[in-house]
């Protein structure tokens, strides 16, 4: 593929950027009174207002032309056809199959995978109902009241986010906890107040060899056996989400209680697979299927909608526009709903593990910026924290506001005040306050520079009627496909993650040097060697 920066469509955008880079949003809105209603799109229960972006109709036309030139439509079709678009691992990328309806046909190597997907979903539903109803009891006969999901990365971030987002729909007599970090403090605090006889562990690891997950799983087994004293208890208090039946059985888990998934499901795209078992237990199968339906609605919108009305495509192209032309390095995710407090962390993995790449699909170094940094905090907490920098700092930050017309917990004027703040922040970022306006308000001349807001800070706003399982599914799918769009433009592989491997290898070498009773002779750089010696000295081990 021709280098991105050499194609005519990219050159046209460079020329266009130079023409409009200093145009203020105040001017764009003044010259086009209908802009706020025209630059919107809607699908799958989500309303998308992108009018507060530093773009014109010509910008959007040029971005759409770029998408066509980079073969975005063909790449979308290839993913949905089950082609092996993850070329470095020779795998299909078919998280969309996980939420396809029962009668759909999606082929991988000529085999329809949808029946197998629904077979796993049906097994998950049956097990979830057993736990929720109390029919599944622990080793002592007590019903299960506590669910602890042990995983890391995609086996943790998705389930945590979905549970927190949809907690209002959950079975409140069940306690859900999540353990991911190999730091023992994580496990200790998650289980401190739990009764082992009433606790079920879900161990989520495709290979059942993941260091962090299996370290925590072995600790969980020891914790359980210390209380119940019989190895047979493991089979009543542990289930697995894995494809390694031999390791699952060796651990003591009945393989009848092993829920599998496929190598065409990437970890950060896996929350709608068996990785979502804890979510299904918490919400119930019906709400889980509602969430899948929301995912599927956005999948179909992404697959079929024209690019100029396609929410993920527009969102992804705008991200490219800011990253590559304005030099924007970060995107702030600002959900004005406390149930979405873990959504920014979830998107960090989805976006940064996907598009944090520096070589093209053909292995050539890129000559342009790729994935930006994602971060955020629920409103209005962030307003009293980092919004100062977004409003008056020297860095341009792209903001995504997410809000809902109805709250799940009506309490007086709380929700109206919350949403007033969201709308106000987007308005303030876009239009700011001039020095003249500050002076007209009576601000002393010496103070006016400090009370001037430059504005022209871009933002997107997503609005839905209320946060439901279906809306959450649509929202997550939108970001998944926005990431895909960005990766297609940049010609990178959004579906591998080789960057996490080197640290794992080095940790495997260093761990014995930390734990050895005999002083090792570490062969690292002088800094790492000194840190190892300091650590061993403070741990009271031989030097």
Curated annotation (Swiss-Prot):
Family matches, as InterPro entries: G6P_Isomerase (IPR001672), G6P_Isomerase_C (IPR023096), Phosphoglucose_isomerase_CS (IPR018189), SIS_dom_sf (IPR046348), SIS_PGI_1 (IPR035476), SIS_PGI_2 (IPR035482)
Domain of life (superkingdom): Bacteria
A GO BP annotation: glucose 6-phosphate metabolic process
Isomerase listed as a keyword: yes
Places the protein is found: Cytoplasm
Top-tier EC class: isomerase
UniProt catalytic activity: alpha-D-glucose 6-phosphate = beta-D-fructose 6-phosphate
Similarity comment: Belongs to the GPI family.
Protein's UniProt name: Glucose-6-phosphate isomerase
Lineage: Bacteria, Bacillati, Chloroflexota, Chloroflexia, Chloroflexales
